Amino acid sequence: MKKILLICLLLVCALAMTACGKEPEKKVAMGPATAVFTTNMGSFEIKLATDMALNTCANFISLANKGFYNGIIFHRVIDNFMIQAGCPNGDGTGGPGYVIPDEFHKKLKHNDEGVLSMANRGPNTGGSQFFITLRDCPWLDGKHAVFGKVTSGMEVVRKIGRSYTDMNDRPLKKVVIEKITIEKR
């Protein structure tokens, strides 16, 4: 009888302990945000989709606020397609040391020039690398998470896109992100 009572007590304790797990994180709204890019070729602004891509935007904002992007180059530029940056190694192989899950929203599409999206190596492998489209690219929908749109300075983005590149689409003259400033607007 004591053995049965002891077993029942242990089962109750075990069940109680499983209920002590971490509560799932709740998304917290962050409000509007604009990323101001200052490069050696000029400046442009991107309105971040904080209301539809909260986690992706929060990751980007955190990296920008830490100065992660300061001094990083646009390492891949393909005219009439996109410009890509965010690799600390400058060659498309690096990241922040972690990955984030893909975050898709039905209203966020690669349907125009100036769309900001996460670069990746496959599903759920985004981190710090991003690209900005130079045209509509619907084949990227559902594969790369959109999280913003250029609102000012698209001529600078186009100018970067027209950079002369080598066989690996790397600009011959470095295009450097001097700083990304996040403004609450």
Q: Predicted segment positions?
A:
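Cyclophilin-like peptidyl-prolyl cis-trans isomerases
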Residues: 5-185
